[in-house]
Amino acid sequence: MLQHFSKVLTAAAFLGLFLSVAGSSPREQVLDDYKNGLGPGWETKSFAGHTQYTVENDGKRFYIKATSNTAASGLFHKIEYEAKEQPILRWSWKIERTKTGDDYAARIYVVFPSLLFWKTSALNYIWANKLPKGEALPNAFIGNAMMIAVESGNGLAGQWLHEEHNIYEDFKKYFKTEPPKVGAIAIMTDTDNTGESVTAWYGPIMIGKDAS
């Protein structure tokens, strides 16, 4: 029960971070290329311990390495733009292994703020442990966040995978309405529920107009 209550607070607090966002975005952009470390647009929010987020380079790419040990903290970037104008979200990621319970080795949030907190919504692109690839379900602790299984299980663990999703179409599909403006994009690797350790890697995130 305490773990479930903690998860509710985590989800609600995370969505609540993005109620005040300003600015605009260019037609197409890389959110951050990490070549000079984490850019100034990133902020961290801890809910249970601290997931360590560091920038590394393997000679082929710059990426964020996320290491979680019984922790749940997110790294988020406030950015405002219309999902209909820039619907494509691209990223690459890699995991060490998937986790059990309500923890996910890797996830990317797209947050759609509302002045009414309970109407703030989010698309969560996850590397799932049990949910089959391509399936989605509401977050178990907060109903206005959809969990979308982009990858699932350990079959491709240890490999860099390149992903692409149309957030405009996804929002309409899962929430049955037109999306408000995007307010933030975030990454999160957590193990506060399982009490284990996990490592994940995130490449640069691209926001664009056209699918590849």
Predicted regions and their residues:
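Beta-strand acidic-aromatic groove motif in beta-rich domains, primarily in extracellular
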Residues: 99-112, 120-122
